[in-house]
Design a protein with these regions (language model features):
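Extracytoplasmic/periplasmic, Sec-exported soluble proteins
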Residues: 1-4, 195
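Histidine/acidic-residue-rich, glycine-tolerant segments that coordinate divalent metal ions
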Residues: 3-4, 9-10, 16-147, 230, ...
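Metal-dependent amide/peptide-bond hydrolase catalytic core
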Residues: 110-290
Length: 290
């Protein structure tokens, strides 16, 4: 979907470059830079001065969670804060026929993964929201050798700042305790990624208005906060500028564009580009072409 975002912004740049004499201000088009690598490329752009003098900022994300032609809007927190953890379970390698002479890091890592699931299930209040996902396990390179170590990598997503601050401690406690109980050790690294995207109330209300004006009131979907992270938060937090971020629907069952993002069969309904450009154009016209 990121190529769709780039296409939308290129269209906006072309459109308003032909209307510069009608703009009562300056329009800056910011293409997303290295969002996938925590802490995200947005903070680098902020440090480079891109946000200097900016009064407000708008963002969007194409989403197969919502039908094409619909806009997901919410006041306040839209996305979770997104962090990464890496764990190295260290054991003692050896021959697979002599496990008693080894400390098996594969079994150790398996127990750590199961233990981590208890954080959300048993150590977090039901009134809080969090997702902890183990997404990579790497270890061993032969069928008959118990390896010396196994690496585990995953992500943590939270909305509460207090809970976010507690997560590294809980992950470390479970990982180190499990490793010690099995005669091994482990190393835990925790990297803070993007903060939550917090939509400004005034701009969010304006977004609802322009969407309703351009596409009809039924195009506005009042959604719940979503768990995927987004480094747009750096523009509003570190950049010190109010912003609004909306979800642009691209789900169309007949076209086969209902697959989730990051699925190998994901396809984008390109009609969503029209709605994305329309949203940006409407917001810019309301602000700069009065």
């Amino acid at each position: 979907g990121h190529d769709g975002h780039a296409a939308i912004l290129l269209g906006i740049a072309k459109l308003f470059s032909q209307k510069t004499d009608k703009l009562n201000g300056t329009l800056i088009c910011i293409f997303q830079h290295a969002e996938e690598v925590p802490p995200g490329g947005a903070i680098e752009l902020v440090r480079a001065g891109v946000m200097d003098g900016v009064d407000e900022i708008y963002g969007l994300h194409l989403s197969s969670n919502y039908p094409t032609g619909k806009f997901g809007v919410v006041n306040g927190a839209l996305t979770s804060a997104t962090d990464r953890f890496d764990i190295i379970a260290v054991g003692k390698g050896g021959h697979s026929s002599l496990p008693e002479q080894c400390v098996d890091p594969i079994v150790m890592a398996s127990q750590i993964v199961l233990g981590l699931q208890n954080i959300v299930a048993r150590r977090i209040s039901a009134y809080d929201t969090a997702v902890l996902s183990v997404c990579q396990i790497h270890g061993g390179d032969a069928y008959n050798i118990i390896p010396g170590e196994v690496k585990i990598t995953g992500s943590v997503r939270t909305f509460s700042k207090e809970l976010r601050n507690r997560m590294p401690e809980m992950i470390k406690e479970i990982s180190e305790g499990t490793a010690r109980s099995m005669g091994g050790s482990c190393e835990v690294a925790y990297e803070r990624g993007y903060d939550s995207v917090i939509n400004d109330d005034v701009l969010t209300d304006r977004a609802r208005e322009v969407i309703a004006d351009w596409f009809g009131e039924d195009a506005v979907l009042e959604i719940q906060p979503v768990m995927p992270g987004e480094d747009f938060s750096a523009f509003t937090e570190a950049g010190g500028c109010p912003g609004v971020f909306v979800e642009i629907g691209t789900r169309n069952e007949e076209k086969g564009t209902a697959r989730p993002h990051h699925n190998p069969q994901y396809l984008m309904d390109e009609d969503g580009l029209y709605y994305g450009m329309g949203f940006f154009a409407a917001m810019v016209e309301r602000k700069l072409m009065k």
